[in-house]
């Protein structure tokens, strides 16, 4: 079938070099986007960075056959806890996977294939067999891997 792509706004923040003293961390300004790839009746939504999941974005994702979604950090304070950074995930414009308003909870119930991508090297879901990896897999998510191919 014919292939098409459409950009859509995703809550996020501006690039670090554009930040002022008090940057908007979950703004929908168009500075942060996702892309929907459409092939015939099949749809893939790619959201490499997301600071939140408002109803309109969840509705868009609900119709996708495949969702590739930001999984930068498992917990919001992961960078601080591991000593690898001073900012929380939300401060960097990324929802954590865990927690009541994290990615696992907010994407729960959506159909289709849900694949986690844009994974920071501190994120324990990268470790096969870790409790965090088992948690995301039990929730119906896949962890993206280098060289992964997706057929719509």
Residue ranges and their predicted role:
Residues 1-60, 146-152:
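Core dinuclear metal-dependent hydrolase active-site scaffold
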Residues 30-32, 40-43, 51-148:
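Cap/insert and terminal regions of metallo-dependent hydrolase folds
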């Amino acid at each position: 079938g014919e292939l098409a792509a459409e950009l859509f706004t995703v809550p996020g923040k501006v690039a670090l070099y554009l930040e002022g003293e008090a940057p908007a961390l979950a703004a929908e300004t168009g500075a942060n986007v996702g892309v929907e790839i459409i092939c015939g009746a099949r749809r893939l939504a790619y959201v490499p960075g997301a600071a939140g999941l408002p109803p309109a974005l969840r509705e868009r994702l609900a119709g996708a056959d495949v969702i590739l979604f930001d999984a930068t950090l498992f917990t919001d304070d992961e960078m601080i806890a591991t000593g690898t950074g001073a900012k929380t995930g939300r401060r960097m414009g990324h929802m954590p996977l865990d927690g009541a308003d994290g990615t696992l909870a907010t994407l729960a119930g959506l159909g289709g294939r849900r694949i986690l991508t844009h994974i920071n090297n501190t994120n324990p879901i990268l470790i096969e067999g870790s409790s965090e990896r088992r948690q995301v897999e039990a929730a119906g998510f896949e962890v993206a891997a280098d060289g992964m191919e997706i057929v719509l």
